[in-house]
Amino acid sequence: AAILRPQLRRLGAQCEAWNSRYQTVEAGLQETPGLSLVPRPAAEKYVGSSIQFLLLDWPPEAVQDVLGRCADRGVELKWFGGAEPSGFTSRYDSWRYAESAPMPKSDRILAGLIDMRIPLTFSLEDCALIARIIRAEVSAVYQAA
């Protein structure tokens, strides 16, 4: 409890800082060909500690190409469409403790779903640069297809 109290006092400011970073990345990714962002309802309250975007109906090889190109430039993205879970990207079909029925509509979305954590150690300038890198690499792979 003693460790948590000071953090609780700063929680509002921390949430605002995350959202500023999220909004910077989001603005930089807007209108990227081949990339979809999930529109957020105006009334929604959220904490943008990560951002998700969609490369809908992309071949797995093209998604992997984007991930590799971004990684080569220092931007680590996580993909929910990989055959095996990586980090926090597990899907329902990789859960070993419960059987599942096929969910083709979910599979289609997960096959193109990309996630990136946004730590508070990133400055707004870092976030703008990261968005430019993602935009450039997605655009390059999309145009080559």
What are these regions (language model features)?
Residues 1-5, 19-26, 38-54:
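Conserved glycine-rich beta-strand-loop-beta hairpin in the small C-terminal domain of fold type I
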Residues 6, 10-24, 129, 133:
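A non-catalytic, amphipathic alpha-helix used as a structural packing/dimerization or gating element
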Residues 18, 51, 70-71, 109, ...:
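Generic structural signal for small/hydrophobic residues in well-ordered secondary structure
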Residues 53-57, 118:
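Short beta-strand-to-loop capping motifs
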Residues 58-66, 122-129:
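Short, conserved charged micro-motifs
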Residues 63-73, 130-135:
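Short amphipathic alpha-helices in soluble, non-transmembrane regions
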Residues 66-113, 144:
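Conserved PLP cofactor-binding pocket of PLP-dependent enzymes
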Residues 98-103, 109, 115-126, 130, ...:
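Long, positively charged, glycine-interspersed low-complexity recognition regions
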